[in-house]
UniProtKB/Swiss-Prot annotation:
Any matching Pfam family: CLP_protease
Active site: S98 (nucleophile), H123
Disulfides per UniProt: none
Protein name: ATP-dependent Clp protease proteolytic subunit 1
GO cellular component, one term: cytoplasm
Taxonomic lineage of the native organism: Bacteria, Bacillati, Bacillota, Bacilli, Bacillales
Highest taxon of source: Bacteria
GO molecular function, one term: ATP-dependent peptidase activity
Species this chain originates from: Bacillus anthracis
InterPro entries, alphabetized: ClpP, ClpP/crotonase-like_dom_sf, ClpP/TepA, ClpP_His_AS
Gene3D superfamilies in the cross-refs: 2-enoyl-CoA Hydratase, Chain A, domain 1
E.C. designation(s): 3.4.21.92
Length: 193
């Protein structure tokens, strides 16, 4: 069962019922709580653009609990975060892995956070190929370029040398919230708002 909770709010005109995500959106909170796919990306991008149109000066809060997912869908979110004027604060609640971790570290500098029991994981992009040898070679080149680009981005956002990032992302590299802070993925581990 996938029930979405509702909240009831008193207004001048009477009671108003919201699904919880719409209510959080009023407070400029966007949640990624699943694998990142095209549908999730479209929803998150729409929310970011809406919040920018509402107020381009106020920060947006992106809460992340995601195992990652599609790189193209992830880049749609990441590019929109960079495109819009408001700072996007990021917060890992639970797990931010793969592209979830990339979104986490791409928040506004000084505004990237993790809750104390969060876990963060970085690794190289995953992919597969089938078909003729030429098609496999083209796909392999694309994945290797993507790997280089992602490692470069992690290095730039964290301040780590690219050689260390390349080494760490060869396999799944898990970190606690405090380890992610030391690595430069988040700026602080928070226990209170």
């Amino acid at each position: 069962m996938n029930a979405i909770p509702y909240v009831v709010e008193q207004t001048k005109l009477g009671e108003r019922s919201y699904d919880i995500y719409s209510r959080l959106l009023k407070d400029r909170i966007v949640i990624i709580g699943s694998e990142i796919n095209d549908q999730v990306a479209s929803s998150v991008v729409a929310q970011l653009l809406f919040l920018e149109a509402e107020d381009a000066e106020k920060d947006i809060f992106l809460y992340i609990n995601s195992p990652g997912g599609s790189t193209t869908a992830g880049f749609a979110i990441l590019d929109t975060m960079n495109l819009i004027k408001p700072d996007v604060q990021t917060l890992c609640m639970g797990f931010a892995a793969s592209f979830g971790a990339l979104l986490l570290l791409s928040g506004a500098k000084g505004k990237r956070f993790a809750l104390p029991n969060s876990e963060i994981m970085i690794h190289q992009p995953l992919g597969g190929a089938q078909g003729q040898a030429t098609e496999i070679e083209i796909t392999a080149k694309r994945i290797l370029k993507l790997k280089h680009d992602i490692n470069k981005m992690i290095a730039e956002k964290t301040g780590q040398p690219i050689e260390r990032v390349a080494h760490d992302t060869e396999r799944d590299y898990f970190m606690t919230a405090e380890e992610a802070k030391a690595y430069g993925i988040v700026d602080d581990v928070v226990t209170k708002k």
